[in-house]
């Protein structure tokens, strides 16, 4: 065996380079407004990735495409196989804990691939994929699934009065009527439609509650009447027995 095989350079070169990380772009995230756009083309990735880990142009991502999913990066970053052995391996998919709103990630192209779940784009410039554990990737995936808090619309007294007046006229106004009212009270037609849906639900609850109260009152009156009749009969029977 040649002595050169045991030189310091060869020994160091043969050591696993597992700590080599896949660095995400430092100049900002790559996001898209639609799912149909490709993440990168054959020659435009050099500005987004380090030259050593730039993905090849023929690489297919998750489900055949590299996509921006709801302004979140979703795809695969590939490390060239000559940079390190297979001990670095593949970051496993999130499995059953992956949220249902994200397409299943099943495409792998070998041990050199690193699967990246959806990550908030604000975090992309600071992410070092190679140092993330499975649990951390799952937490990042859960961040994507959190629902945004809905803002409650606050109506003015004038708007509420106009809405209530129209509701007293009709419980189901058509689109034209809603648009006319929306222009008059400076609201969007969608807000007027939602208000009427909620108001009809409240009206039905009130109607159901009043109906139940009426039934209970009728039952109470009937029970009271029966009790009074029984009392009269008892008094009458007592008088008959005394005579």
Swiss-Prot record:
Induction: Induced by activin (even in the absence of protein synthesis), lithium chloride, nodal/nr-1, nodal2/nr-2 and derriere. Not affected by basic fibroblast growth factor, and repressed by retinoic acid, and by UV light. SMART domains: HOX. PROSITE patterns: HOMEOBOX_1, HOMEOBOX_2. Its main location: nucleus. Keywords: Developmental protein, DNA-binding, Homeobox, Nucleus. Belongs to the paired homeobox family. Bicoid subfamily. Plays a central role in executing Spemann's organizer phenomenon (the dorsal blastopore lip of the early Xenopus laevis gastrula can organize a complete secondary body axis when transplanted to another embryo). This is Homeobox protein goosecoid isoform A.
């Amino acid at each position: 065996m040649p002595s050169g095989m045991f030189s310091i350079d060869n020994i160091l070169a043969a050591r696993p380079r597992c700590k080599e990380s896949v660095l995400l772009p430092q100049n900002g995230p790559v996001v898209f407004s639609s799912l149909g756009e490709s993440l990168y083309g054959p020659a435009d990735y050099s500005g987004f990735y380090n030259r050593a880990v730039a993905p090849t142009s023929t690489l297919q991502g998750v489900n055949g495409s590299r996509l921006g999913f709801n302004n979140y990066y979703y795809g695969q970053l590939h490390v060239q196989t000559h940079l390190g052995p297979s001990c670095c391996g593949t970051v496993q998919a999130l499995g059953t804990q992956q949220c249902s709103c994200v397409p299943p990630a099943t495409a792998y192209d070998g041990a050199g691939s690193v699967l990246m779940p959806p990550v908030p784009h604000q975090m992309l410039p600071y992410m070092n994929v190679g140092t993330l554990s499975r649990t951390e990737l799952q937490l990042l995936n859960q961040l994507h699934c959190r629902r945004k808090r809905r803002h409650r619309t606050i109506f003015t007294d004038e708007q509420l009065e106009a809405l209530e007046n129209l509701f007293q006229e009709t419980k189901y106004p058509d689109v034209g009527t809603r648009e006319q009212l929306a222009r008059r009270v400076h609201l969007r037609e969608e807000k007027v439609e939602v208000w009427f849906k909620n108001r009809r639900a409240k009206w039905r609850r009130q109607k159901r509650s009043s109906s139940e109260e009426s039934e209970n009152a009728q039952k109470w009156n009937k029970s009271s009447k029966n009790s009074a009749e029984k009392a009269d009969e008892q008094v009458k029977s007592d008088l008959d027995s005394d005579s």
